[in-house]
């Protein structure tokens, strides 16, 4: 399955406009948010918002202030179109989690769904801490390495997804603790997703005239998911500021 990739995995997600492109999807997001104290006064940052599926849900469900940030212009354009069609008063911002365009201490909750791995973790994690209010909460869903892989296999996966590295649960925990988060809890999920429930269906916002190469990337992603299903897992990291 050797591909001469002109595009990245994240380019592929943007072109297909995949919403909820993280383990557990919107179903997991709803579960996590339902545990937090959220009302109209809560300020939430959806960091790496993608096409805005999560942001739109939060704004509708909780009627609170939501800020949606993504570095990918195409993703953000699709998010804006979504918010416009729903008449959602969500603030959008193009920018990097490694250098957030916000002053410090302004968010109660930061939601980061399969985002940190695609960045320089040593920059993103301290930035999240900086913009959180005292006692604010970071909810991060991240890929973890469940079993060791050969150097070659690891390199193949890292290069394909464009992630900086693939970390174990303990390595993630250490990084959050080093950033001086007061409390770091880790949770493993075994979600039973009801495929027949229309709300759990993958959300797409397709671009026109999609290059064949994007379908090849999607196919390779499905291949990796199958081959490495026992090796690549995910965790929720809940970090209190």
Roles of regions detected by a PLM:
Residues 16, 143-163:
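Short, glycine-/aromatic-enriched active-site segment of Class I SAM-dependent methyltransferases
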Residues 45-47, 51-99:
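Class I SAM-dependent methyltransferase SAM/SAH-binding core
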Residues 98-109:
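A short acidic, Gly/Pro-enriched loop at the edge of an enzyme's catalytic core
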Residues 122-137:
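A short glycine-rich, Lys/Arg-flanked "PGG" loop and its adjoining helix->strand segment in the class I
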Residues 185-241:
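Conserved Class I S-adenosyl-L-methionine
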Residues 22-40:
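Conserved alpha-helix/loop element of class I SAM-dependent methyltransferases that forms part
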Residues 109-121:
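A short SAM/SAH-binding and catalytic strip from SAM-dependent methyltransferases
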Residues 164-180:
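Short alpha-helix
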